[in-house]
Amino acid sequence: TVADKQARLMPLFKHLTALTREKLPLDQRDERLKGVGILPRGTLFSCFHARHLAEATELYVALYGAKDFNDFIHLCEQARQIVNEGMFVYAVSVAVLHREDCKGITVPPIQEVFPDRFVPAETINRANKEASNHPDQQSIVVEAEETGNILDPEYKLSYFREDIGINAHHWHWHIVYPATWNPTVMGKEKDRKGELFFYMHQQMCARYDSERLSNGLQRMIPFHNFDEPLEGYAPHLTSLVSGLQYASRPEGYSIHDLSDVDVQDMVRWRERILDAINMHYIVDKDNNKIPLDIEHGTDILGDIIESSDESKNVEYYGSLHNWGHVMMANITDPDHRFQENPGVMSDTSTSLRDPIFYRWHRFIDNIFQEHKKSFHPYTKEELSFPGVEVVGVSINSKTANVITTLIKESLLELSHGINFGTDQSVKVKYHHLDHEPFTYNIVVENNSGAEKHSTVRIFLAPKYDELNNKLEPDEQRRLFIELDKFFYTLTPGKNTIVRNHQDSSVTISKVRTFDQLGAGEGVSEDSTEYCSCGWPEHMLIPRGSHKGMEFELFVMLTDHDEDTVAGLSENAVCSDAVSYCGARDDRYPDKKAMGFPFDRKIEARTAAEFLTPNMGLTDIKIKFHG
């Protein structure tokens, strides 16, 4: 049964930070694992680094190809005694998410497997002392430490950047969409993977800017010049697999050549990508021209910029995004003469902590926006839905059209990831943003006289910029964050649509803990969450301000019969957070460009000029009670 399989998987993930350097001798290894074990244990595995990725791919392909579940577990158990710790978790997670006989099984949360990537080193140190000083206590709880102070204005946003949920989401997204995914080897296509790479990261940047404005800071300034000195950042994390700290970055450093790639390569790749965008086509490795058209252009570009194995010409266009992460992570020790750990930018489960992550991704996003500029703005015909009119939009919460945000406490279990030498439970108490429950109320008139199938799209954006000027539609468009997207059948006449925030198509509702999974909770073959991928529910709404920050809530209904994609399976598995994560083994269930209608430039100077009858815009306030 699924529960039995889940129980057999769990021990593989326990106490990985305590593995020794000894490896299984070559003659005792399974033939299929002869090529792995190159990256030493204790090294920080990076799924942005080409060499690390190549070995990880060899491992997950071997695990994916195991003939049955017993064989799979046998291979995993061997691999655990051979390969690098981080690579092991990455490869096993990719295999579990994609093997048919693993449907319904959930990989334990990464924050419990490697708590050292999420919890400050000082806090783990204190937990260690408490555990050894109180061996008789059943459970120990320590408070998470602060990692900075207000001398650094960016510290105001640490609640967002260092949030455990969003960092875990980023890790999971890159497991669902590995850069080295090869459809011919794996036998499955990843629909619109390149476009999803663009959209998911664009949304993270839009969310970050909303948080900045909530805190009275200006929107971020994108990275744009490969020689520019970067701001400083100190992660306060120590990797327990090596005992080395994640490198801090003093202020004023700029990126340097690495042994694998030069800064000049990055400059050249950027120029080539921008040339391709201006010419509206790329050149593949056989010198054929492939157009960057409306339907596939963003997807093709996403594969090239990331770059993934589906890049049409990696020799020519390089791997701009991935090497950018690696260069920034190795900024203080580019040639490894001091044998330091890289910084947090090297790893998907830690990179969101660093302010440069967002500035780097806005730089990447600006390249995509150049491509989007080559298309005409949406016409009224493309935006409208004849016969359908949105009459009213409101938020139903304690106070109408006001959403309250607050700081909540949660606990994270450390003892599965860290071996404290006792059986007791050791937990960290940490604080995170959250919001009160609310529902959307949308009143729609269907004047067509017939039933209509609609897709309801809900977005949110700040109304004013940092200087309190009203944002113009084209400037505001890149700040719109998707809150929900769902199907609704409109009966003729008046329809009142009520939708709970918990049903959002971007968030994951519940993350099962190590203990719950071990006890078989929530384990079933038809679970709908793409298996732990999704924006955390508690971070759905930006923080807002104490006096109530003004946002605009945008609702649009489009014709579902035109949006729908052929060949979708009836009951998609893992489709809880479909907007950011897609659905498992299925096509992306919306034909429109991701981010529609805000993915192309808007020429209208006012909202009234842009709006069509099937859209609604309403002012709401977000109030922070901190």
Swiss-Prot record:
InterPro entries: Di-copper_centre_dom_sf, Hemocyanin/hexamerin, Hemocyanin/hexamerin_mid_dom, Hemocyanin_C, Hemocyanin_C_sf, Hemocyanin_N, Hemocyanin_N_sf, Ig_E-set
Coiled-coil intervals: none
GO function terms (MF aspect): chloride ion binding; copper ion binding; oxidoreductase activity; oxygen carrier activity
Residues noted as binding Cu cation 2 in the record, renumbered to the chain: H321, H325, H361
Modifications after synthesis and translation: Three disulfide bonds are present.
Phosphoserine carried by residues: S374
Gene Ontology, cellular component aspect: extracellular region
Localisation per UniProt entry: Secreted, Extracellular space
Keywords: Copper, Disulfide bond, Metal-binding, Oxygen transport, Phosphoprotein, Secreted, Transport
Tissue occurrence: Hemolymph.
Metal-binding as UniProt keyword: yes
Binding site for Cu cation 1: H170, H174, H201
Matches recorded under Gene3D superfamilies: Di-copper center containing domain from catechol oxidase (1.10.1280.10), Hemocyanin, C-terminal domain (2.60.40.1520), Hemocyanin, N-terminal domain (1.20.1370.10)
Main location (coarse class): secreted
Described function: Hemocyanins are copper-containing oxygen carriers occurring freely dissolved in the hemolymph of many mollusks and arthropods.
Known partners and oligomeric status: Scorpion hemocyanin is a 24-chain polymer with 8 different chains identified, assembled in hexameric substructures.
Family: Belongs to the tyrosinase family. Hemocyanin subfamily.
Note: The two copper ions bound each have 3 nitrogen ligands (presumably contributed by His residues) and share a bridging ligand (possibly contributed by a Tyr residue) in addition to binding oxygen.
Protein name per Swiss-Prot or TrEMBL: Hemocyanin AA6 chain
Organism: Androctonus australis
